[in-house]
């Protein structure tokens, strides 16, 4: 069942301005063709910028370390209230985590009163899902051993949301216990992208470019393979899931199809905000973003 959430009057105005700004920015045109996206991927293969974040201006204690080949940034509240830990997979797949994703992780840690670790996984096109899953499994096994698997939750946005969902099958095949839950914001639920795509209604995402990125991420796997695709992944390996998205984004139809998958529909809660842009939860000025973050914190503390 989908729970639709109407926007406040203030959000209607703010969202209208954000949609206009997005259209004028030309961001969608940048990845509007497969050929242009493949050119960008070729450039990234030659020169991928390193992950070197500015780790100041956060509410929590910030620490960094390397797990396998991934850099991890952990936000730990000065007063930890619950014995849980969240592994956060930032969206991007081909780009390093952004400042807003770091601030988001910091905010969730502060509100949930538990550590949140942002995993800066290896990126396509130089690497693929397999390298990222190996890093995720190493970190997850460590935390599950310390806290118990039921106290470790996976969280991700966009492409990172697809990792949070599909990596559960990898954990199961590696003999690791099921995580305590998954929280996914506007995840890519079908790596092949379904046929019911709201291309015109989304001023940010473009299907041709996104397909090229996802193909690169999947490496030698077909995008329909359950090893990389949440839509065909083993349902029993995926724990209770909270999905948050907009009903106006390109990915919405696939998110809905995933939420009613056999074996998942009774364990999946989907909240869809009316008319917002992809990535709305990062804009702290939106009432909808505040609401989404409250739902995330409630799920973590459950």
What residues fall within each predicted segment?
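A glycine/proline-hinged amphipathic helix-loop "lid/cap" segment
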Residues: 1-78
């Amino acid at each position: 069942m989908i729970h639709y959430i109407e926007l406040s009057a203030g959000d209607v105005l703010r969202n209208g301005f954000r949609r206009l700004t997005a259209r004028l920015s030309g961001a969608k045109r940048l990845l509007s063709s497969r050929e242009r996206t493949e050119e960008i991927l070729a450039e990234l293969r030659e020169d991928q910028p390193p992950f070197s974040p500015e780790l100041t201006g956060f509410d929590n204690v910030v620490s960094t370390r390397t797990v396998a080949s991934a850099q991890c940034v952990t936000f730990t509240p000065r007063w930890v209230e619950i014995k849980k830990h969240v592994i956060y997979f930032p969206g991007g797949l081909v780009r390093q985590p952004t400042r807003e994703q770091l601030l988001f992780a910091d905010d969730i840690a502060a509100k949930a009163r538990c550590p949140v670790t942002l995993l800066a996984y290896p990126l396509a096109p130089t690497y693929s899902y397999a390298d990222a899953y190996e890093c995720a499994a190493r970190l997850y096994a460590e935390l599950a051993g310390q806290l118990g698997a039921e106290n470790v939750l996976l969280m991700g946005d966009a492409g990172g949301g697809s990792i949070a969902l599909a990596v559960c099958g990898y954990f199961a095949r590696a003999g690791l216990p099921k995580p305590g839950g998954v929280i996914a914001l506007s995840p890519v639920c079908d790596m092949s992208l379904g046929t019911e795509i709201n291309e015109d209604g989304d001023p940010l995402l473009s299907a041709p470019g996104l397909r090229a990125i996802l193909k690169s991420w999947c490496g030698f796997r077909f995008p329909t393979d359950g090893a990389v695709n949440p839509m065909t992944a083993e349902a029993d390996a995926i724990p209770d899931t909270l999905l948050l998205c907009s009903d106006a984004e390109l990915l919405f139809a696939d998110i809905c199809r995933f939420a009613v998958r056999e074996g998942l529909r009774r364990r999946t809660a989907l909240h869809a905000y009316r008319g917002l842009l992809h990535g709305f939860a990062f804009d702290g000025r939106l009432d909808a973003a505040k609401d989404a973050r409250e739902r995330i914190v409630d799920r973590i503390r459950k």
